[in-house]
């Protein structure tokens, strides 16, 4: 790709704050986004920002008892746009952003901090029940139906209670009809497990040898195509999920980012699933593109189908902070527009140009 046609990562707006930020999410169908974090006095901070010309306007700010760790709009309809959050007290809550005095849904999901949350089934184009998945330090992964808050609809707990691994991230996928749905979970010892929610069992598992900080399917609402797994020690892996071999599982390609920092997460572009942004612990954003191989599956000597991994190409990178980029989210409505938060207590809005040329 020549230099002229290369996508550029540009910072559009920058706002310094006095709160520690952990996550940010665009409100679907608007020019607004939500940031989630913690005030210095260990209380929760939920802020709504709006793009207004060359400025970033604070629309709403609310303080809650427990610091917020993560959030998602995945289980909410486009009409309601309700935000689901996980906090340091182990609670899952759903908020109506027009009235944040009381949550519309509360459940005690974990004994301590909710490390990650993901939602699925809320949008009109998706399939299946609107569900939230959470994971925590107790090693448990729990799935919640937003229409009932008394108990989780599924729970995957450690087999050995004496050897509990911290579960750091969860991600929904394979939700291409009303029955099928899968859930990925990543653990601090490098385990990656794929749970089949229809069968209620582990469908596949592997170990990537480094703690798993982030995971994402390229699309939630299609028959699973591929997913990214981000790790400590500057590594990430992309697994081809189309073909599962009975013994070898999914084929994968591994990549190391140059700086040697932790890879906090990978976010696939909503308008093009082959492009994804990797956020790193050195404050860099790396833009990658996945290239499929000529043949996506081959037959092994037993006649079983075996997946073939593609390759990843770094399109560009940009340093936007001196601290780790903890949260990153693409705008679902405007291609290339993104918001991100880093541990330097600042929120940034940026744009990636020329994505239509990749």
UniProtKB/Swiss-Prot annotation:
Q: Where are the WD repeats?
A: 63-105, 109-154, 162-205, 207-249, 258-298, 320-358
Task: Summarize subunit and interaction data from the UniProt record for this chain.
Answer: Interacts with PIH1D1; the interaction associates DNAAF10 with the R2TP complex. Interacts with several dynein axonemal assembly factors.
Record protein name field = Dynein axonemal assembly factor 10
Which SMART domains does the UniProt entry name for this protein? WD40
The gene designation is dnaaf10
Provide the function of this protein. Answer: Key assembly factor specifically required for the stability of axonemal dynein heavy chains in cytoplasm.
State what the entry records as the consequence of deleting this gene.
Mutants show ciliary loss with disappearance of axonemal dynein arms and diminishment of dynein arm heavy chains in the cytoplasm. They have reduced beat frequency and dyskinetic motion of the remaining ventral cilia.
Source organism, top-level taxon: Eukaryota
- Write out the entry's keywords from A to Z: Apoptosis, Cytoplasm, Repeat, WD repeat
Q: Where in the cell is it found?
A: Dynein axonemal particle
A GO CC term?
dynein axonemal particle
Q: Name one GO biological process term.
A: axonemal dynein complex assembly
The family database entries (InterPro entries) matched by this protein are listed as: WD40/YVTN_repeat-like_dom_sf, WD40_repeat_dom_sf, WD40_rpt
Q: Which GO terms describe its molecular function?
A: ubiquitin binding
């Amino acid at each position: 790709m020549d230099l002229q046609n290369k996508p550029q990562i540009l910072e559009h707006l920058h706002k310094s704050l006095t709160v520690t930020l952990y996550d940010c999410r665009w409100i679907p169908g608007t020019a607004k986004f939500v940031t989630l974090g913690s005030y210095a006095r260990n209380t929760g901070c939920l802020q709504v920002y709006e793009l207004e010309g060359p400025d970033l306007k604070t629309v709403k700010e609310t303080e809650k008892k427990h610091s917020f760790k993560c959030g998602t709009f995945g289980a909410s309809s486009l009409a309601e746009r309700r935000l689901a959050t996980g906090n340091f007290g182990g609670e899952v809550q759903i908020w109506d952003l027009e009235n944040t005095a009381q949550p519309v849904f509360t459940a005690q999901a974990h004994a301590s901090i909710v490390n990650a949350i993901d939602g699925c089934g809320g949008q009109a184009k998706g399939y299946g029940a609107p569900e939230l998945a959470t994971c925590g330090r107790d090693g448990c992964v729990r799935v919640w139906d937003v229409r009932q808050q008394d108990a989780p609809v599924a729970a995957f707990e450690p087999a050995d209670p004496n050897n509990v691994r911290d579960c750091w991230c969860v991600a929904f996928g394979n939700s291409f009809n009303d029955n099928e749905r899968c859930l990925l979970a990543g653990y601090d010892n490098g385990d990656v497990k794929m749970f089949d929610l229809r069968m209620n069992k582990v469908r596949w598992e592997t170990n990537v040898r480094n703690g798993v900080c982030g995971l994402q399917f390229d699309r939630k609402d299609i028959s699973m195509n591929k997913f990214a797994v981000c790790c400590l020690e500057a590594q990430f892996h992309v697994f081809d999920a189309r073909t599962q071999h009975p013994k070898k599982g999914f084929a994968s390609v591994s990549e190391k980012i140059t700086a040697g920092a932790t890879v906090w997460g990978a976010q696939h572009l909503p308008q093009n699933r082959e492009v994804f942004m990797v956020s790193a612990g050195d404050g860099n954003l790396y833009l990658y593109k996945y290239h499929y191989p000529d043949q996506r599956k081959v037959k092994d000597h037993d006649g079983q189908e075996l997946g073939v991994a593609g390759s990843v190409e770094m399109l560009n990178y940009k340093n936007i902070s001196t601290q780790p980029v903890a949260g990153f989210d693409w705008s679902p409505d405007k291609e290339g527009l993104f918001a991100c938060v880093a541990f330097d207590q600042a929120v940034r809005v940026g744009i990636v140009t020329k994505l239509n040329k990749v």
